[in-house]
Amino acid sequence: MRCRVYYEDTDSEGVVYHANYLKYCERARSEFFFKQNVLPENEEGVFVIRSIKADFFTPASLGQVLEIRTQIKELRKVFVVLFQEIYCIQNASLEPMKPFKVFASEIKFGFVNRSTYSPIAIPKLFKELLSAV
């Protein structure tokens, strides 16, 4: 998924506010499901974040175009671990440039029952979709 950095994404230094990288990653994960005409939840359960490891490299800034790349690191019965990286692929000037990494994260999601929040098996449909990443 690609997105552009807007004023609302930046801090007082003019670079992307650190928490927004997590928002970009969440949007990419959601967009993955939306493109399959599926919500990332069902009547029985929902994905919840168990843990996040985040690494910040070079800050992105206003007008740059970012590309969020997602890989499955581990897919188990009740959880999935995703590795997501964000690259700057275009400057605001629109001139050609070599992409560079700005952020990387490893996020562990559990699938839990909506009412009890107890872990339950990831539904077959979700496992099939995630396996295709």
Curated annotation (Swiss-Prot):
EC number: 3.1.2.-
Keywords noted in UniProt: Hydrolase, Lipid metabolism
UniProt GO MF annotations: fatty acyl-CoA hydrolase activity
Name of the gene: ybgC
Function: Thioesterase that may be involved in phospholipid metabolism. Displays acyl-CoA thioesterase activity with lauroyl-CoA (C12:0), myristoyl-CoA (C14:0), palmitoyl-CoA (C16:0), stearoyl-CoA (C18:0) and benzoyl-CoA, catalyzing the hydrolysis of the thioester bond. Has low activity with butyryl-CoA and octanoyl-CoA.
Entry annotation: catalytic residues: 11
Protein name per UniProt: Acyl-CoA thioesterase YbgC
Subunit structure, as described in the record: Homotetramer. May interact with CagA.
Family: Belongs to the 4-hydroxybenzoyl-CoA thioesterase family.
Statement: the UniProt record of this protein carries the keyword Manganese: no
PROSITE patterns: 4HBCOA_THIOESTERASE (PS01328)
Organism per entry: Helicobacter pylori (strain J99 / ATCC 700824)
Keyword Lipid metabolism appears in the UniProt entry: yes
Pfam families: 4HBT
InterPro entries membership: 4-hydroxybenzoyl-CoA_TE (IPR050563), HB-CoA_thioesterase_AS (IPR008272), HotDog_dom_sf (IPR029069), Thioestr_dom (IPR006683), YbgC/YbaW (IPR006684)
GO BP, one annotated term: lipid metabolic process
